Amino acid sequence: GVVVVVTAVAAVLAYTLYRPASKAAPIPVATGTSSTVPTGAEPGPGVVSVTPGVLRDPVHADVQRVLQAYFDAINNRRYDEWRSVVTSTMSSQKPRQEFLDGYESTRDGSILVYRVDRALDGSLRVLLAFHSTQSLADAPAGHRSGCLVWQVVYPMSWDPRDAEWKVDVGPAATSPQVSAC
């Protein structure tokens, strides 16, 4: 009797804590482990997708929502929207004009979150890949190409003031793997 009641309570609690919000849009889930985009269609759709493994993580919806806003802000050159989903440390390192100049011709797409790990300090490490197109003049030094594939780890920190995760700075984000499309 007691075991059945405890199991039932645990099941209801787990369902309540981990069920998706009833009015939330469905999370795009990638069926493969990489994205291929036909030549000429780069960078691909601007939708942030997650792998099935990430979908099982309790924070997947928050991570997807924040990253979607992050990439939408870059693609639409909306600095204030970008600032709303990054930490104050990150936004202080990239003032408005630097953001606008740096992303002037950038379009990001084919965004896939592979993994979400928790760091010892409680922050997240989000492994993702995406494609970017940009003018050659705007391409990063050492990677002068109009189309790049990025594999990077974005740190995310909890912002208690806004009660949400935010993209952060840190050593995890400083060593992306970049190659031409």
Predicted ranges, named:
Residues 5, 36, 48-50, 113:
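Intrinsically disordered, low-complexity, compositionally biased regions/tails
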Residues 28-41:
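Extracellular mucin-like PTS domains
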Residues 13-16, 68, 97, 101, ...:
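Intrinsically disordered, low-complexity segments enriched in small/polar residues
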Residues 79-127, 133-138:
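Short solvent-exposed beta->alpha transition segments
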Residues 42-104:
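Core segments of small alpha/beta cavity-forming domains
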Residues 1-2, 9-26, 121-181:
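Exposed beta-sheet edge and beta->alpha loop/turn motif
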Residues 8, 12, 32-33, 45:
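N-terminal functional modules and adjacent low-complexity/disordered segments of proteins
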